[in-house]
Amino acid sequence: MLIMTGLELKNNTMRLLITCLFLWHLAAFAQYKTEIYVAKDGSGDFTSIQEAIDNTKSFPDKPITIFIKAGVYQEKVKVHAWNNNLTLKGENPENTIIRWDDHFKKINRARNSTFHTYTLLVQGDNFRAENLTIENFAGEVGQAVALSVEADRAVFVNCRMLGNQDTLYADGANSRQYYEDCYIEGTTDFIFGAATALFKNCVIHSKSNSFITAASTPEGRNFGFVFLDCELTAAPGVDKVYLGRPWRDFAKTAFINCEMGPHIRPEGWDNWSSPEREKTTLYAEFGNTGPGASNEKRVPWSHQLSKKQAKKYNMDKIFEPFLLPSMNLIPVEND
């Protein structure tokens, strides 16, 4: 007959307790919620978007969707790098609004203040947003980012990005981003950054005489910003807008089959007072229509593509080797 001492019994009890706790934690992690609801009126799981994000599983192996009920969510939101495979889904962009009012002078973090002014910052890969408005309502006070995206494989569908200067910071040297059926407005350089980004069927709205894009495409990248089947519009009285200027030496921006209003300047592009960048940037156009699309007076260092050259500006080639089918995020288009 085996007789345990008090010490042995205590040790066995402790081991059993530790084993039970370990199994409980495994079960808890295996059963994490993949659908979370946010509602201002308290009818959901959380009343704050950030609180909902902070309570999701880190590095989940299954996609997590946060459903956001209609309301104005006045908060600064950050999707951390460990919040991958996350979707934020609103009811519709007209009444599901995330807004904040940080700007360069308010943040006061020296020369890098711009990058801290975001309303929504996305760092987690495989991110998706639908039916949302993301707004920086600081006004015309200088740099004030509404949406900042550093993540790879980020998708925005039926969203509005509202602001003035630097509305959308599409950043990340290795970031690939897709925007479909979105509305993006601003004043100066309101779409800027280093990402490879495709804008499909979007409305790009200029609120003042200035510049739409300021790409900082890394050297060696085949694509930077590509606007496909987009509409370029402007506020009343706005009639002197450039398609873009190079934030860095190897900026790449292309407008393909877009409708351009009369606010687009005849020369189209600006060198940002750096003539040497005319040799290294790639600013391209093909098949555009409207009064702003005439290429007769375009700067000589821009590129009017042939039909053959324009064919490479399709989703497969832009995002290669973006694993589109497995992501179930974006339909693959073929020539």
What are the residue ranges of the model-derived segments?
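Bacterial Sec-dependent N-terminal signal peptides
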Residues: M1-K33
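Sequence-level preference for short, compositionally simple segments enriched
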Residues: Q31-D335
